[in-house]
Amino acid sequence: MKLLMLCREPRLYSCQRLKESAEDNGHQIDILDPNRCLLKLSKNAPHFELYYQVNSKSEPYLLPDYDAIIPRFGSTSTRMGCAVLRHFRTKNIFCLNDDVAFLKARDKWLSLQLLTEQGIAVPNSALSGAEFSATQAILQIQSPTILKTLHGSQGIGVILAENRKSAVSIMETLTQADVPLLMQDFIQEAQGTDIRCFVIGDKVVATMQRIGQEDEFRANFHRGGSAEKIQLTEQEKVLALKATKCLGLDVAGVDLIRSKQGLLVLEVNASPGLEMIEKTSGIDIALQMIVHIEKQFKR
């Protein structure tokens, strides 16, 4: 197969592992930055064209069609990355997470709404408009309070407000800067830990428990967190699969938390990192992703 990976940083561990696995399985793979793409729509055939420019001084060239697309772009590239994914989906080319599912997962509030609609428990959450009083809005959520920007990954854009006064100050400042925030209950009993479930298709292929640094409420690897092996219950596996399916994803990193109220889904990541979970679980996830693409291509 001829594969395309959409990625801004091809040197990242996840991109390198997927490239190695694809080539080891006999496939050709290009790694391109979606922000260096140009999409063209025309009344006359061909109606859809996609060009690529290696650098600002190079001549753009027309990209060929591929057999499958692997999206690995970050939150800052979501708009262009999803436009490129839609281009290929329009041509009936398999995308390992299409643009529709990607956009659902990348919008934190929308994803929480969709999960809740399907009866999937999430932390108590609230979203207020720019003209709604922050002082009144914060009363809907417990204190301490988690504040999250609607778009972001790797723990970036997540703030713990220790009291309501701090929460209001942060909300008013960021609202003034036109940065919308959602509010969530802080799950104190989790003590800075969560469970990452890596889902491919209809299977949870790997898991780990992530542990935040001392005095750090975020358990993300990129925030200096560590990880250890963990055995999921059957209920946790079912929940991870249900959350993935709810957003229409083929591949997902589902973050769960064990709370006093029961299992909660914190987030569903459409482009989950491989490094920490491969090293913790000892499972070759990159290979399993390539094998999943092969199965879809043969259908």
From Swiss-Prot:
It comes from Histophilus somni (strain 129Pt) (Haemophilus somnus). Residues 112-294 form the ATP-grasp domain. One of its GO terms (cellular component) is cytoplasm. This is Probable alpha-L-glutamate ligase. Its cofactor is Mg(2+); Mn(2+). Mn(2+) 1 binds at D255, E267. One of its GO terms (molecular function) is ribosomal S6-glutamic acid ligase activity. Mg(2+) 2 binds at E267, N269. Belongs to the RimK family. InterPro entries: ATP-grasp, ATP-grasp_RimK-type, ATP_grasp_subdomain_1, RimK, Rimk_N, Rp_bS6_RimK/Lys_biosynth_LsyX. It comes from the Bacteria. ATP binds at K148, D185, F186, D194, R218, A219, N220. Binds 2 magnesium or manganese ions per subunit. Mn(2+) 2 binds at E267, N269. NCBIfam families: rimK_fam (TIGR00768). Mg(2+) 1 binds at D255, E267. Keywords: ATP-binding, Ligase, Magnesium, Manganese, Metal-binding, Nucleotide-binding, Protein biosynthesis. The keyword ATP-binding applies. Pfam families: RimK, Rimk_N. Gene3D superfamilies: 3.40.50.20, ATP-grasp fold, A domain, ATP-grasp fold, B domain. Its EC number is 6.3.2.-. GO terms for biological process: protein modification process; SOS response; translation.
